[in-house]
Amino acid sequence: MIDWSLCPAVERHPEKVGGSWVFRNTRVPVVALFENLESGASIDEFLEWFPGVNREQVEAVLRYTIESLGTDRSAA
């Protein structure tokens, strides 16, 4: 499981979206990015559909995910 607390592009507040991790200063859950990518959407489409999220945030989340998965792999 990824510890999102160190990713600067996201935040979590109990009063926002039930405490889910969201893109900073939005109510867009981080999981929405991965669900849309899994369904075949492009990053540009995601950004169009969720205008509160910017490209830098998406890139930061993807980089953080890759780094976290690399850390998990080296710990195994």
Which role does the model predict for each range below?
Residues 26-76:
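Long, charge-rich, low-complexity alpha-helical segments
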